[in-house]
């Protein structure tokens, strides 16, 4: 088995409060244990009172949510966000633990706070997603409350959230229609694949509504958004699950395998492309700084003196002669400070002359 095959898949489980996200985690954990493939679990919800599963790493072990609220004079949502921010400052230590455990597990499960916007739209949430995705195949499981999604407006709101998560994280996403033992999710699958079916459902909801003109406006808005997102639905995988009976867990794991392949074929090349762009940008900045330093010290790259005519040095605005280096914004003291900074950065002692330093910088530019 190769190192590539040994890499576990990180599954970030997100969902609205009451969607059954934590119960889904419990059932998925039990299902994997029954297959003798126990996952490694992280709990990132500092406000949860009781977990129905045993977390290997629990934010509550290091962050006291109520104490954070009291100390920083925050409300519930502010307390959760601040707790998550504090935890992320030590996430490099979490990553080291995961790297040690990674060869022994197939799945890393991450349970997130029920306030979905706190995780998805915060800096700490982005850091966690990016850090995990840079180390292992990573996907997002978006848990939807199926019984509540029978309303077309509620369902459309859930799809907009899914769209925003896909846009923000740029990670493979699976929509999990939970509680299928209470409400069959077949209607939602039809709405995602058949626009006319969804239009009929919107019309039906309007007929049952007593809001009159407002209902007509909302129906038109929902229809327009559905038409716009039709292409978006084609790039989503969706499964039906029951966190109580365990139905659909095998389907979910199959969807995860497909998302791992998508991660390797689409996310990894894009990540490498962005790294290369950053590297090239840093190189250009470095060259620009070196060129600026040599210009400030009146030394060109090839150490050639170039003469200036009167017309070259003549200011085009008022016809007066100007020094080419006059408006560079740097004083002699500034140049001295810049040289000192380069000496420190390159580890060059003060014994080496400025001329020798410039020769070394020039050689680096040519490399």
UniProtKB/Swiss-Prot annotation:
GO CC list: cytosol
Site (Stabilizes the phosphate intermediate): 77
Presence of the UniProt keyword Phosphoprotein in the record: yes
SUPFAM superfamilies referenced in this protein's UniProt entry, alphabetically: P-loop containing nucleoside triphosphate hydrolases
Modified residues annotated as Phosphoserine in this record: 311
Protein origin, superkingdom: Eukaryota
Keywords: Coiled coil, Cytoplasm, GTP-binding, Hydrolase, Nucleotide-binding, Phosphoprotein
Motif segment (Gly-Pro-Asn (GPN)-loop): 75-77
Biological process according to GO: RNA polymerase II core complex assembly
Acidic residues bias locations: 312-332
Subcellular location: Cytoplasm
Any GO MF annotation of the entry: ATP hydrolysis activity
Binding site for GTP: 15-23, 178-181
EC number: 3.6.5.-
UniProt cross-references to Pfam families, sorted A to Z: ATP_bind_1
Annotated segments matching region Disordered: 306-332
Main enzyme class: hydrolase
Primary subcellular site in the record, as a coarse category: cytoplasm
Subunit structure and binding partners: Heterodimers with gpn2 or fet5/gpn3. Binds to RNA polymerase II (RNAPII).
UniProt function note: Small GTPase required for proper nuclear import of RNA polymerase II (RNAPII). May act at an RNAP assembly step prior to nuclear import.
Protein name: GPN-loop GTPase 1
